[in-house]
UniProtKB/Swiss-Prot annotation:
HAMAP family: IPP_trans
Classification of source organism: Bacteria, Bacillati, Actinomycetota, Actinomycetes, Mycobacteriales
Enzyme Commission code: 2.5.1.75
Annotated positions for site Interaction with substrate tRNA: 100, 121
Subunit note: Monomer.
Cofactor(s) needed for function: Mg(2+)
Originating organism: Corynebacterium glutamicum (strain ATCC 13032 / DSM 20300 / JCM 1318 / BCRC 11384 / CCUG 27702 / LMG 3730 / NBRC 12168 / NCIMB 10025 / NRRL B-2784 / 534)
Biological function: Catalyzes the transfer of a dimethylallyl group onto the adenine at position 37 in tRNAs that read codons beginning with uridine, leading to the formation of N6-(dimethylallyl)adenosine (i(6)A).
Protein family according to the UniProt entry: Belongs to the IPP transferase family.
Region of interest (Interaction with substrate tRNA), ranges: 34-37
Entry protein name: tRNA dimethylallyltransferase
Entry binding sites for ATP: 9-16
Highest taxon of source: Bacteria
Molecular function (Gene Ontology), one example: tRNA dimethylallyltransferase activity
Length: 301
């Protein structure tokens, strides 16, 4: 039976390159698990591989949503599970590539999403309107520090959702997620790219500089014409949020660059913390030869 391989780890650690290399070795197809690469036209700012960079490897779950759509882990899970099972039915190896934490977990674990209640949600949305997202996120931190650690303090939708789940279930938001010591769906093997700040931070700065050199601002301007606004899932993405603020005169372009770098570093710390808690991950050194290390772990070297 074909076993899927998941490639996880922090932003700028080389997941896409490792995914392509493994797909070549294992006759695989890539399933994207980066929530922002699901958006059409969000290419430069998400380091989405170009068609040429995909080297003939089929990719799934790229360019699925319009920038006006609200992201949905449940919708992604349904669509991506279907993709993985289709790839397996054709005798090919699904290579799941991405660092979006809840999206990875929704795919490799059989995550049944907790209930919703429009009245409870409306109450938290009213409180959001009253006190603002950062204050509401601080309340979440008091109730459930683990949930607050993986939800950005400027993400109103997921902050409200976490509070809704806590109230409806009487448990921490994290308790609604499957345990990370359960067998992964399909027996998926999880390969993680281990990095140090000393190695990764310069890569983040170089990647951010390259984004701006390659036309990131023009990309955002084009997406604004497609309906991108700051108060949306896509508009709150790291980099896009800062460029939109600079376009609106709310910060300088220098600040936009610096805050993209620091925002990415903050996100990387959360990714490290999240994936380090998953003992099913087999780690490879991102600064070495991760492909050779991964193949050895998989018993293919």
């Amino acid at each position: 039976m074909v076993t899927p391989i998941a490639v996880v780890g922090p932003t700028a650690s080389g997941k896409s390159a490792l995914g392509i290399a493994l797909a070549h070795k294992l006759d695989g197809e890539v399933v994207n698990v980066d929530s922002m690469q699901l958006y059409k036209g969000m290419d430069i700012g998400t380091a989405k591989l170009t068609v040429e960079e995909r080297e003939g490897i089929a990719h799934h779950q790229l360019d699925v949503w319009d920038v006006t759509e609200t992201a949905s882990v449940a919708r992604f899970q349904s669509d991506a599970v279907a993709d993985v099972e289709d790839i397996m039915s054709r005798g090919k190896t699904p290579i799941l590539v991405g660092g979006s934490m809840l999206y990875v977990q929704s795919l490799v674990d059989d995550w049944q999403f907790p209930p919703t209640d429009s009245a409870v949600r409306a109450r938290f949305e009213a409180r959001l309107a009253d006190i603002g997202v950062e204050a509401l996120h601080a309340e979440l931190t008091q109730l459930d520090p683990e949930a607050a650690a993986v939800i950005e303090s400027n993400d109103p939708r997921r902050t409200v959702r976490a509070l809704e789940v806590i109230e409806l279930t009487g448990q921490p938001f994290q308790a609604s997620q499957p345990p990370k010591d359960a067998p992964p769906r399909w027996g998926t093997r999880i390969i993680g790219l281990k990095t140090t700040p000393e190695w990764l931070n310069p890569r983040i700065e170089q990647r951010t500089a390259r984004m701006f050199e390659q036309g990131f601002v023009a990309e955002v301007e084009h997406l604004v014409q497609q309906g991108l606004i700051a108060d949306s899932t896509a508009g709150r993405a790291i980099g896009y949020s800062q460029v939109l603020a600079a376009m609106a005169g709310e910060m300088t372009w220098e600040d936009a660059f610096e805050r993209t770098v620091t925002g990415t570093r903050r996100y990387v710390r959360r990714q490290r913390s999240w994936f380090n808690r998953d003992h099913r991950v087999s780690w490879v050194d991102a600064s070495g030869d991760p492909t050779a290390q991964a193949l050895e772990i998989l018993g293919l070297q």
